[in-house]
């Protein structure tokens, strides 16, 4: 993802690492007092993003997290050989309950 703008401090980008790495990142942000965080993923990592939110919501902070919004979409990605393909994306916004 070179050439993109820097990610905001309340965003967790889900990729190829184990799910617990992203769970820890989300919990760290929530414990630092960030009011709302966004979990973003695309392609095959979408299921990891959903797993991340569910683990935070059910195992670590039960009854303390609410899902604010879920956005799905697609991006056009150009491969190294010049072909374009669409990749699905997801953004899940969560926050601590008041």
From Swiss-Prot:
Pfam families: Alba (PF01918)
UniProt subcellular location: Cytoplasm; Chromosome
Protein name, entry field: DNA/RNA-binding protein Alba
Post-translational modification (record): Acetylated. Acetylation at Lys-16 decreases DNA-binding affinity.
Protein keywords: Acetylation, Chromosome, Cytoplasm, DNA condensation, DNA-binding
N6-acetyllysine sites (modified residues): 16
One GO term of the biological process aspect: chromosome condensation
GO molecular function, one term: RNA binding
NCBIfam families: DNA-binding protein Alba, PRK04015.1
Keyword Glycoprotein set for record: no
Organism: Metallosphaera sedula (strain ATCC 51363 / DSM 5348 / JCM 9185 / NBRC 15509 / TH2)
Similarity comment: family membership: Belongs to the histone-like Alba family.
Lineage: Archaea, Thermoproteota, Thermoprotei, Sulfolobales, Sulfolobaceae
DNA damage is among the record's keywords: no
Gene3D superfamilies linked: Alba-like domain (3.30.110.20)
Protein function: Binds double-stranded DNA tightly but without sequence specificity. Involved in DNA compaction.
GO cellular component terms given for this protein: chromosome; cytoplasm
